[in-house]
């Protein structure tokens, strides 16, 4: 995800291949919400409030609601928090009420989710001509 988002300009982030399709900003922000959810499940806590009110998919037609640098920063921050938690769990410094298999499935699931959406982002960049 980090590599896919590294070279994205704001005009590319909010471009849509067609009116009914998600833009790159929405795809990235959706993944951020999902990663936050997984972090909460792994830790057994309620994560801090999300950047925007709502759930899962957020309409981001342009930078009016949230600018691309803020979205990109939110993605980076959530990925960092999730990676740190997974490392803490693996080292035994943080406990989870979930079984090892449940933790594995959540981490594998969100990793596959990131790869899937990173591929979508790469495709959107290619379609845009970026």
Task: Give the positions of each predicted feature.
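Amphipathic alpha-helical packing segments from all-alpha helical-bundle domains
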Residues: 1-4, 78
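Short, contiguous alpha-helical
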Residues: 2, 10-56, 96-130
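Short coil/turn linker and secondary-structure boundary residues
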Residues: 8, 22, 63-66
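Extracellular-facing binding/remodeling surfaces
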Residues: 9-11, 88-89
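Acidic/histidine-rich alpha-helical segments that form the ligand environment
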Residues: 58-95, 105-110, 114
């Amino acid at each position: 995800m980090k590599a896919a988002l590294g070279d994205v300009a704001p005009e590319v982030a909010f471009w849509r291949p067609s009116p009914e399709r998600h833009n790159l900003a929405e795809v990235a922000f959706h993944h951020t919400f999902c990663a936050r959810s997984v972090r909460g499940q792994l830790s057994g806590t309620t994560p801090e409030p999300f950047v925007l009110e709502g759930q899962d998919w957020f309409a981001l037609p342009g930078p009016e609601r949230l600018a691309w640098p803020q979205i990109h920063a939110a993605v980076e921050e959530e990925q960092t928090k999730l990676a740190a938690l997974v490392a803490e769990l693996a080292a035994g410094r943080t406990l989870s009420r979930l079984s090892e298999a449940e933790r594995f499935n959540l981490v594998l699931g969100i990793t596959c989710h990131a790869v899937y959406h990173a591929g979508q982002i790469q495709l959107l960049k290619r379609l845009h001509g970026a």
